[in-house]
Design a protein with these regions (language model features):
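Short, amphipathic alpha-helical interaction segments positioned at domain boundaries
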Residues: 114-135
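C-terminal regulatory/effector modules of DNA-binding transcriptional regulators
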Residues: 210-330
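A short, conserved structural fragment
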Residues: 92-102
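Short acidic, hydrophobic short linear motifs in intrinsically disordered regions
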Residues: 63-73
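Minor-groove-contacting beta-hairpin "wing" of winged helix-turn-helix DNA-binding domains
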Residues: 103-108
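Mid-protein regulatory/catalytic core that forms ligand/cofactor-binding pockets
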Residues: 143-239
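Short alpha-helical segments that sit at the start of domains
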Residues: 18-55
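Short, hydrophobic-biased segments on the C-terminal half of alpha helices
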Residues: 85-89, 97, 155
């Protein structure tokens, strides 16, 4: 499915920030349309810029896409050719995408660290291990704050790996990621955290602080979203065979995007804190939905191209990372 490779430009177009605050709700099953797209009444229509990034991110690594194919896909969502060409020009100018051959585009190299993070959703649970009760902690008091862009990137990196603030100078998450502190530190750096974080294992919290740490994540909200997302995927899977090809492409793009966003931003909490079986169920249903989505988009991609995942909408947004679903309000 589509990934949020739109992390590419941190100034004019900040796709990861857009990605992280998108919160579509499908509970009332009410949809409206634009072009062939069916999307929830609360959701925003797809923009030309984000559609370009989403489409390019589904292709095999470094595989270029002709502008004609992008224009055809845009028509499904009521986006005109001129709008797409303007979006392509702006994204290329901001180094979000690149082109070696006239009329063919692919994601830039700057997008790859986050793209790898998103591609991992089908196997995300392979990245967790049993929890020994300790936490990974990042000390933040010495970090420079004058560079707001760098500070935003650090915040996003921490949120992507499930960290939450335990105290004014301490971000924590359960120590249940494979590789422990060393691997987590490397992943933060790969996601743009600079300078290298002061990251360490935190043990033996007093009972009061331990309870406070466990309550940093809104687990009831997360579990409710697991159930809702699974139900949405199952309903859409049942509907898609009755849709036209264009409608199936558009619906799988929207519904799948919500599920992938949720999985990529999941804090991957251990079973001692959250219902991990419910999370696993969403991953499994999404794997099945991805196969359906790929089939719908096969004709668009062409017989010679094996999509890495079916295109899905990763959203457009302007909010800060604290909008990530499942974080306890403070």
């Amino acid at each position: 499915m589509f990934t949020f490779n739109r992390l590419v430009d941190f100034q004019e177009f900040d796709p990861l920030c857009h990605f992280m605050s998108q919160r579509y709700r499908y509970s009332n099953n009410e949809f409206r349309t634009k072009g062939s797209l069916m999307y929830p009444k609360q959701a925003k229509p797809v923009s030309a810029k984000t559609l370009v990034i989403d489409l390019l991110s589904t292709m095999p690594a470094r595989h270029p896409v002709p502008v004609g194919a992008l224009v055809r896909a845009a028509a499904l969502f009521g986006i005109g050719e001129n709008s797409m060409r303007v979006a392509l020009a702006r994204l290329r100018s901001s180094a979000s995408i690149e082109s070696d051959t006239r009329g063919f585009y692919r994601l830039s190299r700057k997008a790859q660290p986050v793209n790898r993070k998103v591609r991992s959703w089908p196997t995300l649970e392979q990245g967790v291990c049993d929890w020994d009760g300790s936490y990974l902690a990042v000390e933040t008091s010495g970090l420079p704050r004058r560079d707001r862009r760098a500070a935003k990137v650090r915040d996003r990196a921490l949120r992507l790996l499930g960290f939450e603030r335990l105290s004014p100078a301490l971000m924590v998450r359960p120590n249940n990621l494979v590789g422990g502190a060393t691997t987590c530190r490397e992943r933060l750096v790969e996601l743009g955290f600079a300078p290298t974080p002061v990251l360490f294992q935190l043990n033996d919290l007093d009972p009061k602080l331990e309870q406070r740490a466990r309550n940093l994540w809104a687990t009831a909200d997360l579990e409710a979203r697991y159930a809702e997302t699974r139900a949405n995927l199952e309903r859409s899977t049942a509907r898609l065979p009755e849709r036209s090809l264009d409608e199936a492409m558009a619906e799988s793009f929207q519904i799948g995007g919500e599920a992938v966003r949720q999985l990529v931003l999941d804090p991957l909490l251990p079973k001692e804190i959250i219902d991990t079986a419910a999370r696993s169920a969403v991953v499994e249903v999404m794997r099945q939905y991805d196969r359906v989505g790929r089939e719908a988009w096969k004709q668009w991609a062409g017989a010679s191209v094996e999509l890495e995942r079916s295109p899905v909408d990763m959203g457009t947004l302007d909010s800060v990372p604290s909008e990530v679903p499942g974080l306890a309000s403070r």
